[in-house]
Each structure stands twice: as C-alpha cells, then as structure tokens.
Amino acid sequence: MRTKVTLACTECKQRNYDSMKNKKNDPDRLEMKKYCKFCKKHTLHRETK
C-alpha cells in the first residue's frame, strides 16, 4: 500500500514536498536531493512524520 509522506529540507527544516512511498519496498526514511525555495539551492530532503 502506498502512503503519502512529506519531505522536509535538512538545512532550514521547511516542509516543501509531498510524495508517495510503498512502505513494503522502502521501510526506511526516504531521502532525496531536491530544490528548496527557501534556501534557494538544492539540499537533502528527508521524510518527516
């Protein structure tokens, strides 16, 4: 089952993106490098609760 997750910037802690993830295939926290409009650069975004 796919669940909705929120991705937050690791530098400024802003929650910028929503994504879907399959908990069976990805039990760990999701991490992606994405653009943060608050930092104005590409940063690591991590899954939040």
Curated annotation (Swiss-Prot):
Gene3D superfamilies: Ribosomal protein L33 (2.20.28.120). The keyword Ribonucleoprotein applies. InterPro entries: Ribosomal_bL33, Ribosomal_bL33_CS, Ribosomal_bL33_sf, Ribosomal_zn-bd. It comes from the Bacteria. Keywords: Ribonucleoprotein, Ribosomal protein. GO terms for molecular function: structural constituent of ribosome. GO terms for biological process: translation. It holds the Pfam family Ribosomal_L33. One of its GO terms (cellular component) is cytoplasm. HAMAP family: Ribosomal_bL33. Belongs to the bacterial ribosomal protein bL33 family. PANTHER family: 50S RIBOSOMAL PROTEIN L33, CHLOROPLASTIC (PTHR43168), LARGE RIBOSOMAL SUBUNIT PROTEIN BL33C (PTHR43168:SF2). This is Large ribosomal subunit protein bL33. It comes from Clostridium beijerinckii (strain ATCC 51743 / NCIMB 8052) (Clostridium acetobutylicum).
